[in-house]
Amino acid sequence: MQLDQSNKAGTEPSEVVSRYLEAIYYMWYEKEPLRSARLADWLGVSRPTVAVGLRRMTRDGLVRMNGRKEIELTAKGMRTAESIVRRHRIMERWLTDGLGLDWVTADAEAARLEHAVSEVVEQRLYEVLGRPETCPHGNPIPGHSEASAKEVRLSTLGAGNRASITRVSEVAEREAPLLLAYLHKRDLTPGRRIRVLEADDVGKTLRVQVADREVTLSHETASKVWAVPVAKS
């Protein structure tokens, strides 16, 4: 099966536009409010800079502002963003599965390499890697798979609940790369089953068991981990 390359009708976007589209796509996917101030925080640039960038992207037919002053990707913008994200996630899989890099390093290197990779190399890597469905931390590769409709944030689970981790939010990956290393080191990775031992609504913490260890997470951290609840045995 060939990955969808239908967005390649025009020229490749610049690295700056790619960064904007990637960030907007991640926030949209995580159902975060898509406002320019939030985008500026994500990208680490000033609000006036984002305003200029969004005006250019609107002119180029990539984004639009809705009635709530939120950013929306147009059909063209979505196709372009999906292409960028797809290439990034395939590169991450190659860097982790093929070269043995850790999550954080792989993400940083993929961001550097993705702009220099052709469609031919991208497709070949995808095939060589066995047509992976997700990035190393579980986020679906656009055009090939989708997140489970049953998944919930770990922070919403109560004591006694069991779940299978599906993915770590891209928001965590981009805004708190050390969080990726923290979760990886504690085996809170896709495919792992966990049991909630304690949900402290006052202290805003979640104590979970994963394999033979116990891990305490803040609600903020737990909200960046997605999982599918499983029936109690």
What label would you give each PLM region?
Residues 54-55:
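Short, hydrophobic-biased segments on the C-terminal half of alpha helices
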Residues 58-66:
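A short, conserved structural fragment
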Residues 115-223:
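Mid-protein regulatory/catalytic core that forms ligand/cofactor-binding pockets
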Residues 48, 104:
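Key DNA-contact positions within bacterial/archaeal DNA-binding proteins
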Residues 1-44:
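Extreme N-terminal segment that seeds HTH/winged-HTH DNA-binding domains in transcriptional regulators
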Residues 69-88:
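Basic, amphipathic "hinge/linker" alpha-helix immediately C-terminal to the N-terminal HTH DNA-binding motif
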